[in-house]
Amino acid sequence: MSRVAKAPVTVPNGVAVTQNGRQVEVKGTKGTLSFNLHALVELKQEEGKLQLAPVKESKDAWMQAGTARAVLNNLVKGVSEGFERKLQLIGVGYKAAVKGTSINLNLGFSHPIDYSLPEGVTAETPTATEIILKSADKQLLGQVASEIRGYRPPEPYKGKGVRYSDEVVLRKEAKKK
């Protein structure tokens, strides 16, 4: 049985949650997000709290309720506070610059990479080797950060590449003669 589903989701002031059948929509200062509830899960709204419960008592229903509760909590947090992800560019000549809705990346290739940001994600570069991505949608933010990191993932010998700011790169020792 999922213990995650038993905890209610607290809805802060300024966030509105509406349910239309299986579609749940969350509106806040940072935008509007929505998702579809699983058929085994039902949503109950009380003043300032959302409670998810399985329709019937089964292991699968509790698993889906726990997942739906985590997703709903991320939606509420996203539209009220937002999420951010920091990337670091480590390597000689590695640079990033934001131009409108795209990021220009120089990652040691013979050509620069222009990464077009999807709608709902913003980027800023406080320094040439640091990228800060912000979004209300946690899943989309993680996907964008992963795609940027995928152009030049950190290599284990020198640690060069694009990495998350909280990522620890395991270093290998060079081959000895």
Curated annotation (Swiss-Prot):
PANTHER family: 60S/50S RIBOSOMAL PROTEIN L6/L9 (PTHR11655), LARGE RIBOSOMAL SUBUNIT PROTEIN UL6M (PTHR11655:SF14)
Organism encoding this protein: Acinetobacter baylyi (strain ATCC 33305 / BD413 / ADP1)
Role played: This protein binds to the 23S rRNA, and is important in its secondary structure. It is located near the subunit interface in the base of the L7/L12 stalk, and near the tRNA binding site of the peptidyltransferase center.
InterPro entries attached to this UniProt entry: Ribosomal_uL6-like (IPR000702), Ribosomal_uL6-like_a/b-dom_sf (IPR036789), Ribosomal_uL6_a/b-dom (IPR020040), Ribosomal_uL6_bac-type (IPR019906), Ribosomal_uL6_CS (IPR002358)
Alphabetical list of Pfam families matching this protein: Ribosomal_L6 (PF00347)
Gene3D superfamilies for this protein: Ribosomal protein L6, alpha-beta domain
Gene Ontology BP terms: cytoplasmic translation
Similarity section: Belongs to the universal ribosomal protein uL6 family.
Keywords linked to the UniProt accession: Ribonucleoprotein, Ribosomal protein, RNA-binding, rRNA-binding
Molecular function terms, GO-annotated: rRNA binding; structural constituent of ribosome
Annotated NCBIfam families: L6_bact
Record's GO cellular component terms: cytosolic large ribosomal subunit
Protein's name in the database: Large ribosomal subunit protein uL6
Complexes and interactors: Part of the 50S ribosomal subunit.
